[in-house]
């Protein structure tokens, strides 16, 4: 399993619990260190779990695969920043610091190009992302990101929609859709 937006390490923890080898790439060194500590609590001697600090747009994944004798990844899971809704760092390479939607999508496309070429044939890549609401309109980040995959020849297998009630991004605005519909 490859997670190019590792963040808190949830996918690596779950991979360990299932006995699956996993590699996570995180841009921010402090986040990578903290996540590695949490991941090591769930240590599983029966699988490889590796945390890498780097930029998923250009990290040399091939050398990593050679190091661990990995012929291909069987699953890639991407949970990128929701463009600029939450600024995760001051790093200019952080997708959450993209100045425009096109810049965000171009950078996201670079991650797709750099990671999915190592995906085993007939295997899957999942993208977890929410949409953005700004200037009285919905910006459908999920569909824009999905289109980045389609433009690269991926086949769409499913669109799963989950409404999270209370989140940091919604800031106590559970009734916002009712308000906007009126």
Predicted regions and their residues:
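Class I S-adenosyl-L-methionine-dependent methyltransferase catalytic core
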Residues: 1-182
């Amino acid at each position: 399993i490859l997670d190019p937006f590792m963040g808190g390490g949830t996918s690596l923890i779950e991979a360990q619990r299932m006995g699956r080898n996993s590699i996570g790439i995180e841009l921010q060194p402090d986040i990578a260190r903290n996540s590695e500590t949490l991941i090591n609590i769930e240590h599983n001697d029966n699988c490889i779990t590796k945390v890498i600090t780097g930029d998923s747009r250009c990290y040399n994944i091939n050398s990593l695969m050679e190091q661990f004798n990995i012929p291909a990844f069987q699953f890639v899971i991407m949970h990128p920043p929701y463009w600029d809704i939450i600024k995760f760092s001051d790093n200019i390479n952080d997708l959450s610091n993209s100045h425009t939607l096109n810049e965000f999508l171009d950078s996201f496309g670079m991650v797709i190009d750099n990671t999915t070429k190592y995906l085993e044939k007939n295997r899957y890549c999942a993208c977890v992302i929410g949409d953005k609401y700004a200037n009285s309109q919905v910006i459908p980040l999920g569909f824009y990101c999905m289109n980045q995959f389609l433009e690269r020849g991926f086949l769409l297998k499913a669109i799963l929609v989950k409404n999270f009630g209370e989140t940091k991004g919604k800031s106590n605005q559970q009734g916002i859709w009712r308000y906007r519909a009126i």
